């Protein structure tokens, strides 16, 4: 995913120490919600093994994923997340994990995800058109990191080629291999 590429770049650039960092290093408010969030590492979010209770149920308008799609305040939606089990127990697809990862990257780098995509992926890849990332509201501007990156198919194909080329575009290493 694009968020995983941005995480690799944030680590390479020294904004994030590594994938074994607890998410609470970047989102300390989670630990105030529930001290067990301190056990959740970026690695757990990346692998969707966080143990966070998150309903990925697209048929229900009241599921967590529906709330994340519709909310105008993702920060408030994230504040409602709960720990269901210790991290790294089992894989469970979770848009919530990707959202937390995106928020941690933004907090660590001091940049919005769409800014990082534009300068650190799209420009070096030679993308044909700008991408846009849907946000919770014009006022808050929090990217819906779990979805909603809008771009041309050709530019998404460039991401695939970037991965096939081990993160390189010509001689330039765009993302860590």
What are these regions (language model features)?
Residues 81, 86, 98:
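Acidic/His-rich structured neighborhood in mature extracellular/periplasmic domains
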Residues 12-52, 80-82, 109-146, 151:
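Active-site helix/loop module of the DD-peptidase/beta-lactamase fold
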Residues 149, 170-177:
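A penicillin-recognizing enzyme superfamily signal
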Residues 30-33, 64-65, 86-90, 102-107, ...:
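Second-shell loop/turn segments in exported
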Residues 97-104, 145-168:
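Active-site-proximal alpha-helical segments within enzyme catalytic domains
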Residues 56-60:
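Short, solvent-exposed loop/turn and secondary-structure capping segments
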Residues 1-19, 45, 101-105, 156-162:
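Active-site SXXK
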Residues 61-80:
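Amphipathic alpha-helical interface segments
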């Amino acid at each position: 995913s694009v968020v995983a590429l941005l995480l690799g770049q944030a680590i390479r650039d020294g904004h994030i120490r590594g994938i074994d960092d607890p998410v609470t290093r970047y989102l300390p408010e989670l630990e105030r919600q529930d001290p067990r969030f301190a056990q959740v590492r970026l690695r757990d979010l990346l692998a969707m093994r966080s143990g966070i209770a998150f309903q990925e149920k697209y048929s229900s308008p009241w599921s967590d994923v529906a709330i994340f799609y519709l909310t105008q305040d993702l920060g408030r939606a994230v504040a409602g997340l709960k720990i269901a089990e210790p991290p790294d127990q089992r894989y469970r697809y979770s848009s919530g994990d990707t959202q937390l990862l995106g928020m941690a990257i933004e907090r660590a780098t001091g940049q919005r995800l769409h800014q990082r995509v534009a300068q650190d992926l799209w420009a070096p890849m030679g993308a044909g058109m700008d991408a846009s990332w849907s946000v919770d509201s014009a006022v808050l501007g929090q990217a819906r990191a779990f979805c909603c990156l809008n771009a041309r198919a050709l530019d998404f194909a460039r991401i695939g080629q970037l991965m096939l080329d081990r993160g390189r575009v010509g001689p330039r290493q765009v993302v860590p291999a």
